[in-house]
């Protein structure tokens, strides 16, 4: 298995798909990285030469990925919570912050239902 940006990349997948194993790289960015590095999108990772891998590493290194990106996202959410703005309050309460309804649904953010004694 090859390592790029501290992540083990699966050998049996095509380069375009395998790069999406890195946090912060989706299909579109993976396509652009492959094109910029001059690596075919449909070439399996195990078939790439060392020079191809080095070019991929260089291209991935130009983006904020993995730990740095996770840290940045966490800091952005923490900043919102410290400001006390509406989005920060919603994050603090564990509720959706993009305007979705919460009377019904929103179970993913709110967690499992809490039983209320005396109901029924």
UniProtKB/Swiss-Prot annotation:
GO terms for biological process: translation. One of its GO terms (molecular function) is structural constituent of ribosome. Keywords: Ribonucleoprotein, Ribosomal protein, RNA-binding, rRNA-binding, tRNA-binding. It holds the Pfam family Ribosomal_S13. Residues 96-120 are annotated as: Disordered. GO terms for cellular component: cytosol; small ribosomal subunit. It comes from the Bacteria. Signal peptide: none annotated. Belongs to the universal ribosomal protein uS13 family. Located at the top of the head of the 30S subunit, it contacts several helices of the 16S rRNA. In the 70S ribosome it contacts the 23S rRNA (bridge B1a) and protein L5 of the 50S subunit (bridge B1b), connecting the 2 subunits; these bridges are implicated in subunit movement. Contacts the tRNAs in the A and P-sites. Part of the 30S ribosomal subunit. Forms a loose heterodimer with protein S19. Forms two bridges to the 50S subunit in the 70S ribosome. PANTHER family: 30S RIBOSOMAL PROTEIN S13/40S RIBOSOMAL PROTEIN S18 (PTHR10871), SMALL RIBOSOMAL SUBUNIT PROTEIN US13M (PTHR10871:SF1). This is Small ribosomal subunit protein uS13. It comes from Dechloromonas aromatica (strain RCB).
């Amino acid at each position: 298995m090859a390592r790029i940006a501290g992540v083990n990349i699966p050998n049996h997948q095509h380069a375009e798909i395998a790069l999406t194993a890195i946090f912060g790289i989706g299909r579109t960015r993976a396509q652009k990285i492959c094109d910029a590095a001059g690596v075919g999108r449909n070439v399996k990772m195990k078939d790439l030469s060392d020079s191809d891998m080095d070019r991929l590493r260089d291209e991935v290194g130009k983006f904020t990925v993995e730990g740095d990106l996770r840290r940045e996202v966490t800091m952005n959410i923490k900043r919102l919570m410290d400001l006390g703005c509406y989005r920060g309050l919603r994050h603090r309460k564990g509720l959706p912050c993009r305007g979705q309804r919460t009377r019904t649904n929103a179970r993913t953010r709110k967690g499992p239902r809490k039983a209320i004694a005396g109901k029924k």
